[in-house]
């Protein structure tokens, strides 16, 4: 006879679902508005999306730390709240980039903004749960929306990028599902805290380490795809090149924040259980990723592809902090992305401004270095701002990313990994070359003759976004200490 199911309203705790429900409801409202009136201007959808995200931000900020909800499937801890806030802030920065001075195909569709909000909800589900099934649901919700957003750019290479991303995403999802299945077979649970408890009691069993090895390898491969770690990074440059510049910048930050949070929960569990080879594997992947991506970035002819390889290198840099498995190391991950987010989105936004009606310099690339030759004479303020972003990405003090790099290196040294800090320093020196290369083109070279250079995509919303990104990049020295204190408090309160 089946046992009766008792549903406790206390265990529901639906307030933990509020941020995701706000994003989903917002997307549905936009679709309904389009059904009622198909002629509404895109600026209305932009403003409505920003309003929904602001409400979402407030709902997330109002959550209590270390709370469970929805039958204990939702986990609201410090890491969950921080990552949701960062995801929303990154999204608020991205959305105004739709209000360009020219009409672009994807932004004329209300579905673009609805899909964008559904994607945000997917990312929020990923970071606000330690249940492997809900993480998978969030991952696929966000991924399917993102594939469509890339394709909506409506160019041949955008379709190619969407198909490549879809193929790699499907492969990553398969590895994640298989890894989760092995974990469930081992422990009889898909909730990470229960998985850790069961594994801890069975570590000495014969043959168990082989099964743990299988699950960890499958999950590592899945998140290596999502974080574009070597050797699973090959899709990223082509996808970034095919996507619109703002969306490429967004993809280099927000999806990776969500993937890093899940990686912290899963691989931190393995390291805490004493599975030391997981730490070693992560360190090897991190070093190979940051080094090889930097070497590839050195030989790129296109600024957008250079920034794509740069983003891969930064992901490797941060992955090394994950292997430390300390509160300081985990804090450095969130600090780095909080600072990197403004700088990298700002850099990609500058590419969005410097558009041409036709490819004037190269048959393949949209943003070859030659395009930026003499940029200081064509658009002086833009050249200075782009130069600041490049100096920040290179880790030059006192700009924002410098503080992130220093904190990650400090965490490595304090954990006894002096060699890792040295590798990070050497990679930062290599990266400085290709960032300074663009600065040399902009400030020390003459504009290409006999070419009518047009930078025509600037609008006031874009100016506001770039101004905000510039202030965050230049003024980091004034807010870095309070930011570190807040992040450290929230992460230590979560037990990481």
Language model features with spans:
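Alpha-helical transmembrane segments of multi-pass membrane proteins predominantly involved
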Residues: 1-496
């Amino acid at each position: 006879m089946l046992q009766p199911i008792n549903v406790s309203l206390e265990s529901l705790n639906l307030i933990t679902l509020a941020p995701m429900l706000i994003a989903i409801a917002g997307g549905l409202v936009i679709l309904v508005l389009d059904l009622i009136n198909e002629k509404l201007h895109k600026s209305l959808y932009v403003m409505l999306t920003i309003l929904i995200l602001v409400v979402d931000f407030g709902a997330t900020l109002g959550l209590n730390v270390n709370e469970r909800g929805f039958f204990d499937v939702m986990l609201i801890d410090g890491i969950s709240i921080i990552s949701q806030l960062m995801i929303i802030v990154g999204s608020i920065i991205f959305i105004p980039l739709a209000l360009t001075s020219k009409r672009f195909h994807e932004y004329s569709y209300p579905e673009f903004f609805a899909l964008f909000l559904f994607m945000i909800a997917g990312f929020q589900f990923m970071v606000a749960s330690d249940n492997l099934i809900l993480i998978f649901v969030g991952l696929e919700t966000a991924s399917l929306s993102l594939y469509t957003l890339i394709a909506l750019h409506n160019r041949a290479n955008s379709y190619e990028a969407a198909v490549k991303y879809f193929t790699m995403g499907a492969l990553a999802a398969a590895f994640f599902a298989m890894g989760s299945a092995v974990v469930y077979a081992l422990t009889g649970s898909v909730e990470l805290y229960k998985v850790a408890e069961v594994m801890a009691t069975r570590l000495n069993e014969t043959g168990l380490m082989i099964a743990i090895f299988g699950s960890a390898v499958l999950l590592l491969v899945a998140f290596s795809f999502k974080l574009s770690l070597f050797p699973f990074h090959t899709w990223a440059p082509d996808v970034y090149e095919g996507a619109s510049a703002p969306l490429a910048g967004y993809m280099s930050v927000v999806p990776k924040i969500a993937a890093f949070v899940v990686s912290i929960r899963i691989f931190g569990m393995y390291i805490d259980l004493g599975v030391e080879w997981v730490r070693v594997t992560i360190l090897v992947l991190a070093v190979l990723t940051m080094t090889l991506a930097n070497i590839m970035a050195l030989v790129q002819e296109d600024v957008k592809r250079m920034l794509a390889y740069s983003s891969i290198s930064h992901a490797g840099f941060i992955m090394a902090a994950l292997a430390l498995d300390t509160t300081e190391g985990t804090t450095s991950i969130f600090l780095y992305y909080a600072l990197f987010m403004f700088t990298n989105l700002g850099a990609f936004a500058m590419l969005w401004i410097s558009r041409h009606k036709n490819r004037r310099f190269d048959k393949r690339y949209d943003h070859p270095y030659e395009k930026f030759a003499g940029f200081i004479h064509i658009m002086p303020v833009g050249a200075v701002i782009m130069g600041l972003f490049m100096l920040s990405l290179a880790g030059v003090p006192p700009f924002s990313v410098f503080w992130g790099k220093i904190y990650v290196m400090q965490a490595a040294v304090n954990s006894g990994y002096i060699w890792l800090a040295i590798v990070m320093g050497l990679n930062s020196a290599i990266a400085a070359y290709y960032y300074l290369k663009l600065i040399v083109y902009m400030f020390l070279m003459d504009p290409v003759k006999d070419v009518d250079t047009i930078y025509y995509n600037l609008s006031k919303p874009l100016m506001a976004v770039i101004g905000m990104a510039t202030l965050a990049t230049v003024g980091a020295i004034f807010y870095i200490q309070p930011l570190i204190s807040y992040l450290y408090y929230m992460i230590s309160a979560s037990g990481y």
